[in-house]
Amino acid sequence: MDPRIREHAETIATHSTGIEAGDTVVVQLPPAAEDLAVALHEICGDRGAQPVFLSYSQRADRAYKRAADSFEEPAHRRALYEETDVFVIARGGANVTEGADVAPETNAAYNRAIEAVKRERLSKRWCLTQYPTPGHAQLAGMSTEAYEDFVWDAVSIDWETQGAFQAQLVEILDDAEEVRIRSGDETDLTMSIAGNTAENDTGEANLPGGEVFTAPVRESVSGVVHFDLPLYRYGREIDGVRLRFEDGRVVSHAADRNEELLTGILETDEGSRYLGELGIGMNRAIDRFTYNMLFDEKMGDTVHMAVGSAYPETVGETNAVNESAEHVDMIVDMSEDSVIEVDGEVVQRDGTFVFEDGFEAA
């Protein structure tokens, strides 16, 4: 076994989830990630935790969605989740476009059926990570070996140092009222974050981490945004997304590629037309775009926003939590002709923060 796999497992178990004696641990991994499953099970055994292994197959998931006429909440899965302390989930499918021929309305119906079960999982200790596979390497335009280096380097940085760097932005956002994002001629978006909390992502729920994220006040988002980096969702690429918000809600949308898939996402439920997250990428160690949101949203010089559900921990007691069966992140490249303003003050210009060397106020 590659020693980096054991290091990855140790980071998940110790830093990300804190697995300890008596914990029940669900390990959900694709077949390609068996070595990571083995390493995690060894750690569980050493610590006196009880693991349950779930194998995730994209082909099986596709087959079920295409064959079913309707979906119901999986009560057996909910029962398992209620008895679970820790979830470890790794991506790493052989074919990243496996679900491309599942209809958008089918995905929406399935997501609505499992929404409550997903919320149960999110209420526990959990970590979503990546296992490097040839399929993801191909999507990133990299050799398998180079992609393995990329992934294992990204998950093994000094998270204490990274967290201290990000804490400078958390301090700025914590007492802030309003954020404005401007980029080029097509993005000018304003939102209130008053009363909400900025979270410092240091590789716990997401590994790798490397962002600061919060939630907009639900009805406050106003303006237009052009997400100029593409994303993969349900096995298909969505590119050139443009959204217009009024009173927090998406009132018009367009995409250069797979607009009908974007439409299906926005029509999932009432909450899927509202923003649930504003995230600011701060991980300078992730220095290339790979068509994998787990990494891409953490890149420095980027901002991402998610239509759909908000993370409850980011929403203050006096504000409403946006609820949705969807949570779809999309990215704006902030490296050129771009600013982030907080309460009227520029805190980032062209990807450089006010607390970094090289920042130019104007």
In which residue ranges do the predicted regions lie?
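Active-site bordering "gate/hinge" segments
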Residues: 1-222
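Metal/cofactor-centered catalytic core regions of large enzymes
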Residues: 34-35, 46, 130, 134-362
